[in-house]
């Protein structure tokens, strides 16, 4: 007669408690990479939006492995990353209790999608945010005070961060409210950082100026929400035997009689998903350029490779499910990342210095799949589908000449 195994290690990690809904929607950077003054001034993080997944084919270049010189199919995630707009500078001074904000300077002009973030109901508001801050840039006394503030930053501050926001008008979303974030500047002296930030106020910063191909980065995001779940789904506890009274997907014992309370380490039902998570060491397989004009023509071959020279875009046939088309710059990351489609993703430079062969391997893609993600896709491009299917009714109706209505 069979019975369940009573002794087993605990299920679930206690380091992520409490398992409750995150109070922030955008991933927060809690630790920044160590500053290196010998390098040029650069941003250490970027914001993007998860579009979807596809797969690639490449040849492995890691001598000594059995799979070296062999082709490998890998899943990748596409994160759309339109240029960020720099709208402010923040200086921090070092105190015995840590960093303290010293000065915050905003740009003269802030777009409506940025100012919307400071209102709960933009339509009913008076829309007067930053009107006083902007006046400082227009009169002589205000300009003198701004120069004094920038000089004080160079003299007293130890850490310089810039305030950036995303451009929602470039994305296929209904949302108009931009996401705003402070991003730390690393490299160079404090004076060079302040000058870098001052020169880029109200200007766009593209993703290829922050990251590069083959770089290892960290991904910070809020996971996909699953709602209220039981212990078997939430903690992966073992199901009880079939004849158990009052249910199988439960915990048989929730603790001893005394202490007369349920311990915090006992698996219980509750919220699953929508947790703030940081995933380390994601490799960038490609930084693609969005649709752009060259010699009067629209260039959209950001999914072509040296082996597959087909003129095709990274957007699959029919668009990414629940997202749409990717028309801006994008970052292709190996594997999956946290969050659902359209979720804002924080990309941060790695905190570690990588020396492994896998991290230093040069990635050369042979093929990027662009078939439809709504089913079992067969065609890579719309032209390939039309050549195989032949003329369809909708194409014949377009080519049919218009008949006059006069008899």
Swiss-Prot record:
The molecular function terms in GO held by this entry are:
RNA binding; structural constituent of ribosome
Residues of the region (Disordered) are 1-35, 383-407
Here the segments flagged for biased composition (Basic and acidic residues) are 394-407
PROSITE patterns registered for this protein in UniProt: RIBOSOMAL_L3 (PS00474)
- GO cellular component term, pick one: cytosolic large ribosomal subunit
- Transmembrane regions listed in the UniProt entry: none
The protein's superkingdom reads: Eukaryota
* Any one Gene Ontology BP term: translation
Composition-biased stretches (Basic residues): 1-31
Supply the alphabetized keyword list. Ribonucleoprotein, Ribosomal protein
The answer to whether keyword Ribosomal protein applies is yes
Q: One Pfam family this chain carries?
A: Ribosomal_L3
Question: What is known about what this protein does?
Answer: Heart- and skeletal muscle-specific component of the ribosome, which regulates muscle function. Component of the large ribosomal subunit in striated muscle cells: replaces the RPL3 paralog in the ribosome in these cells. The ribosome is a large ribonucleoprotein complex responsible for the synthesis of proteins in the cell. Inhibits myotube growth and muscle function.
Q: Which family does it belong to?
A: Belongs to the universal ribosomal protein uL3 family.
| Quaternary state and interactors | Component of the large ribosomal subunit in striated muscle cells.
Q: Which protein, by its recorded name, is this? A: Large ribosomal subunit protein uL3-like
The primary gene name is RPL3L
